[in-house]
Amino acid sequence: MQKLTTSIRKMQGRKILVIGDMVADVYLNGQIGRISREAPVLILQQVDEKIVPGGAANVVANTATLGGEVFAVGVLGDDKYAEKLRGLLETYGVHIEGLVTDESRPTISKVRVIAGGRATVSQQVVRIDNESKEPLAKKIETQLIAKLDAILPQVEGIVLSDYGSGTITENVKKLLLNYAQKNKIPSIVDSRYDVGRFGGVGYVKQNDTELAAFVGRDIDSMGALIESGSELLRKTNASAVLITRGENGMSLFERSGAVHHIPVSDKSEVFDVSGAGDTCVAAFILALTGKINPINAARISNYAAGIAVRKLGTSTVSFEELENATNK
């Protein structure tokens, strides 16, 4: 454990580019008042509204709180959520000059309505998503590429955080992967729906559900996991694939054929898995850019994700929390 504690100090100050679908995660808390006369629904009196970085913006935030110097690249609308996200990321010390404004589309938002009463436990009753399904306009893509051309020479690692909302176009993807390969810097993709299009990336992170969707079959045994993880590794031609498996920990597949299974760091007090994958990616890329080998990078990521799941909602993990966890 002492080795990991020493290793994580190499993560500090690493310059990381995070590009992807920036999301405003909104938590709207309300107190149950009465039944509406208009329809058989509850009337909630809004108590507060909390907005936190979600999607790729959560990767940005976690990379920053874990000690990285982060350059955020993505597309926001011209609305209150864009303004709030920019402000939040600035408070983390993030470089936000790579965020492009597209007035034709809203900032992606996921509004969770949470209802409760004085004698009841608060719980989420509905989620309202708002995003454009239209492809990025050519002029917006051109602006993104110009931002990348300016930022890439400054960074040591690249994260592609693809939530399926179209920020990482084919041209953007090619630019990033070619740059990473040419300059021999680590790149990692976490793609919710289409990881197969990222062939040539350095590293791949998926959860077990995403892996099952990619291979088109259930992963119901260790044999199925090994077969599926190896298939993803082969088809993406990555250096390694990291699969997060919930309460079963993580599995790292390396090009050498080695497979490492890492148990969860702490099975107690799992409150919420929201955003834990983003924390995992943030820790992994920081470790890789700190010249930490992939297996130890995965172990560090496992500790970081273990801290994240013990927090309610989308959240960040600090370097101090990670250091304390690896010291235990």
Located regions from the model:
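Conserved N-terminal subdomain of the carbohydrate kinase-like
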Residues: 13-16, 24-157, 318-328
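Structural motif
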Residues: 17-19, 127, 156-159, 188, ...
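Active-site metal-binding loops of divalent metal-dependent hydrolases
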Residues: 22, 163, 279
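Extended, hydrophobic alpha-helical segments in both membrane/secreted and soluble proteins
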Residues: 159, 176, 187-189, 193-197, ...
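Conserved post-catalytic alpha-helical subdomain immediately downstream of the catalytic base
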Residues: 239, 265-325
